[in-house]
Amino acid sequence: MRAARIETCGLPPVVADRPAPVPGPGETLVEVRAAPITPLDLLCATGSSYFGTPTLPYVPGVQGVGTADGRPVWFPTPAGMAAGDGSMAGLASVRAEDLVELPPEADPYAVAALGLSAVAAHMALTWRGELALGEQVLVLGAGGVVGQAAVQLARLAGVRRVVAGARSPAGQERAKRAGADAVVALDTDDVTDLAIRFSAACDGPVDLVLDPSSAPRQRPRPAPCARAAAWSTWAARRPRPARSTPPRCAAARSGCSVTPTTS
């Protein structure tokens, strides 16, 4: 089979023929259809990640989409983080318990591009953030895949307003295309200036903040959130009146489709 192979950390992979993997106990052979190149793949390939130097050579690819026994599946791998090969090959041997079966109509390329990023956005909004109908949401880092997914998922959930923050002009444009009602340029470190921008973009207090940027928790909060929501990486919300059954967002109770954009 053809596979990408990291032979030297810090250098591009080499594409070459390689023997097909032999599944071990509890593993399943997956015919790979799509494999994204994620930031984690790039980090592991440098040899300087927090997982340590990977055993060389190895096939990169920490996640992918393919078919197993005729079923469309999404799958993760430990490539670059532990011994073993990844998804950037014609075939991959994956633990059967790690396979996530997909609907037959799912676009394998869209699912591969979204992957864990869309799951992270969905979980942050719904499980951690308890997003409810009619709320106002602020998404930082909205030009990245997690941020774009969060903007679209929030829209599908029936929020009243989505405000996005992105640093680069390209990221701001991606956030707009994802459906943000307003986009704040994060191109300055002037806290007062940023507070003015957020205040102008937000329609009153923000109910939920999603921050996938892994920034320090002590960073200044946008002014509309200062009185209401404690700051937290990933998701934080302002207190709301107690109610017996909070209205569940549409994205939490039904299937939804989000679209990755990188250009």
Question: Predicted regions span which residues?
Answer:
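NAD(P)H dinucleotide-binding glycine-rich loop of Rossmann-like/cofactor-binding domains
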Residues: 73-141
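NAD(P)H cofactor-binding loop motif with strongest signal on the N-terminal glycine-rich segment
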Residues: 141-142, 213, 236
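Mid-domain Rossmann-like dinucleotide-binding core that forms the NAD(H)/NADP(H) cofactor-binding site
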Residues: 111-188
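N-terminal Rossmann-like NAD(P) cofactor-binding module of classical short-chain dehydrogenase/reductase
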Residues: 74, 209-210, 232
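Glycine-rich phosphate-binding loop and adjacent beta-alpha segment
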Residues: 159, 216-263
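Glycine-rich beta-strand-centered segment in the early N-terminal region that forms part
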Residues: 19-37, 48-82, 86
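Short amphipathic alpha-helix with an adjacent loop that forms part of the alpha/beta core around
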Residues: 191-203
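Short, glycine/polar-rich helix-capping loops at beta-to-alpha or helix-loop-helix junctions
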Residues: 88, 166-174, 240-246
